[in-house]
Amino acid sequence: GIFSKLAGKKLKNLLISGLKSVGKEVGMDVVRTGIDIAGCKIKGEC
């Protein structure tokens, strides 16, 4: 019915926002790691 449709929509939105924030965290880690690797390559410390 109407209730399950609303519940499904809310769950979907929660899931999407959860995935987005997880993606952002992972993305930041990847960027940081990339910067670290680039930095040590430039300095020749890898």
From Swiss-Prot:
It holds the Pfam family Antimicrobial_2. The keyword Iron-sulfur does not apply. One of its GO terms (cellular component) is extracellular region. It comes from the Eukaryota. Coiled coil: none annotated. Transmembrane segments: none annotated. Its main location: secreted. InterPro entries: Antimicrobial_frog_2 (IPR012521). Shows antibacterial activity against representative Gram-negative and Gram-positive bacterial species, and hemolytic activity. This is Esculentin-1R.
